[in-house]
């Protein structure tokens, strides 16, 4: 019997990367997982009877409500955990160059969507008298010297939300924690569109942590283990924490 046996857990970004690794590991620990992603459902999990999936854009105004309703329809009136893993990068734009499109999209996916999902699950958790929410922040949630202004704002904001929710609902059995991840995973796209001057300004900080030539130093599966610890009863007294998963990058 796994340490998440029969727990119902919602995981965003479940089609790939950290989200998929977390969904896979949660299922291995006995959880019933409801995944959400803009991409198609992962083929590796489609045959698992304890996995349900909603393909949707988290920024659609009705997506959080639809997702929670679909989870309840699949697994019953119970949500033990919410893992907000989905996120997008910006183009490293600074305050003098960030476009409205990049700013709005980054804040919508990285900050607004997690908050709106929390708004939907907290009443269910409150009724049960327990629940655990884990948000995925970043080195950029702790530092101003690792990414663009939009991504930095969104991840700082998510840490603030985490602490606010932890304090507000601590007497109702609801916990809220965050991890701060440092990894190159997901760094895709047309790099020619990125703010090259801003990237150069961040390069010394990046170089202090990872060899940019060999890619990620932290595996998705390693990040997933910390997420699962925080959503599980193993961390029942951990609340309002921000745990770095960054191989000591947060020390600089």
From Swiss-Prot:
SUPFAM superfamilies xref list: NAD(P)-binding Rossmann-fold domains
Coiled-coil ranges per UniProt: none
Effect of deleting the gene: Impairs the synthesis of anditomin but accumulates preandiloid A.
A GO BP entry: terpenoid biosynthetic process
Signal peptide annotation: 1-25
Residues annotated as binding NADP(+): 11, 57, 119, 151, 155
Gene3D superfamilies: NAD(P)-binding Rossmann-like Domain
EC number: 1.1.1.-
Pfam families from the UniProt entry: adh_short_C2
Pathway connected to this protein: Secondary metabolite biosynthesis; terpenoid biosynthesis
Gene Ontology MF: a single term: oxidoreductase activity
Function (record text): Short chain dehydrogenase; part of the gene cluster that mediates the biosynthesis of anditomin, a fungal meroterpenoid. The first step of the pathway is the synthesis of 3,5-dimethylorsellinic acid (DMOA) by the polyketide synthase andM. DMOA is then converted to the phthalide compound 5,7-dihydroxy-4,6-dimethylphthalide (DHDMP) by the cytochrome P450 monooxygenase andK, which is further prenylated by the prenyltransferase andD to yield farnesyl-DHDMP. Further epoxidation by the FAD-dependent monooxygenase andE leads to epoxyfarnesyl-DHDMP.
Family the UniProt entry places it in: Belongs to the short-chain dehydrogenases/reductases (SDR) family.
Designated name of the protein: Short chain dehydrogenase andC
Organism: Emericella variicolor
